[in-house]
Design a protein with these regions (language model features):
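Cysteine-centered metal-binding/redox modules
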Residues: 5-148
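C-terminal, active-site-flanking charged/polar segments
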Residues: 1
């Protein structure tokens, strides 16, 4: 499959998804940053204003493995929330395979990780730790590992 076909699949899901909201007010806590990042990514998709290339081949096995990893995460952490799971799945596929951005927004900080960007490269202080987790999405995230 190529990125055009993958984008079309993502777009078809997103165009019918109408439950996206931006948190009111401005907050720098990790959840608010992630929610806004996902919202603006969603808007980018439905407005078809993405900076990624749409003529690159993508390995179907990698995309399917990625989808399975998202499903696994949600079954472990939020079973039954299929609509939100699929929303996050398609946002994450878009970020990873089409626009090649970090799965977490630049500036997010938690006790477990911080994501930064330098010279158009993303860095994550948690990748080295979390990539060892079963079905970790870190395997596919473009962020590079960085020490604290």
């Amino acid at each position: 499959m190529n990125t055009k076909e993958l984008f079309d699949e993502i777009y078809e899901y997103m165009i019918n998804y109408d439950h996206v909201r931006v948190p009111l007010g401005y907050s720098t806590d990790a959840i608010s940053l992630l929610t806004r990042y996902n919202y603006y990514t969603y808007k980018e998709i439905i407005n078809r204003k993405h900076p990624g290339s749409l003529n690159i081949e993508v390995d179907d096995k990698k995309v399917n493995d990625f989808k399975d990893r998202v499903d696994y995460f949600f079954e472990e952490n939020s079973p039954g929330d299929y609509e939100y799971r699929d929303f996050i799945k398609y946002i994450s596929i878009y970020l990873t395979f089409i626009v090649k951005k970090s799965l977490h927004p630049v500036g997010i900080k938690s006790k477990d990780m911080t994501v930064t960007k330098d010279n158009n490269k993303f860095y994550c202080t948690g990748k080295k730790r979390f990539i060892k987790d079963r079905n970790s999405l870190c395997k596919y995230c473009v962020s590079r590992s960085k020490s604290n």
